[in-house]
Amino acid sequence: MNRTLTSALALGVSATLLSGCAMLGVGGGGGGGSDTKYVARDVNTLYNAAKERLDANNYEVAAALFDEVERQHPYSPWARRAQLMSSFSYYMGQKYNESINSAKRFLSIHPGNKDAPYAYYLIALCYYEQISDVTRDQKITEQALASLGEVQRRYPNSRYAADAGLKIDLVNDHLAGKEMEIGRFYQRRSLWLASSLRFREVVDKFETTTHAPEALYRLTETYLAMGLPAEAKKSAAVLGANYAGSKWYERAFELMQKHAPAA
């Protein structure tokens, strides 16, 4: 998935979280590679060091330093913010499991916090960023869909709900693509029933995706191959009613005229 686009909202919120640094009165400094070693430091110094590493795109070190803020100053008001910034830093560094764990820890400690929606959104983004091509296992894709749906259910009026909805559409399109890929695989091997079940899944569950017209055409093909012209006609009719101008309907019409003109 397009990381640049999906990161935009996450970056915007992280800027809001970091903007509070000015309230601490922190200045320069931040150290070098020794920043992540355990050295007792005041919260200002630690948080500033983490922010500098984040600004420098040194995400893993930034995450470790934000973790240190919580570890060394667990009762500071900045510990809670550091937890969430740790999750964001891991996300930006593409350490998605670590980001998810950090966000879940934040939610377990602060379930009703005003930034809880952002934590749920970060978790969803971490799964979303890991969606692979349609030829691979889709477990991560399903986790992304579930997490994005949770953002919508829990916080329908939040700034994240609309973006989650857009991503859900993309994830559904991806899942439909997987079903189509498997269906075509079976079809090439003349496994008509198996292929028809995959195409039917797309029509029934992912009818709003870009794959629906082709799925209806493939159903027309497979039903004809199985000697079921009446079922083929139904699929072609649905295709014509919903996608009359598509190339898939033109092909289905030609197919029906050639193989089942009386159906």
Model-derived features: where do they sit?
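Sec-dependent N-terminal signal peptides
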Residues: 7-13
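Acidic, polar-rich low-complexity tracts and alpha-helical solenoid repeat scaffolds
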Residues: 2-6, 17-263
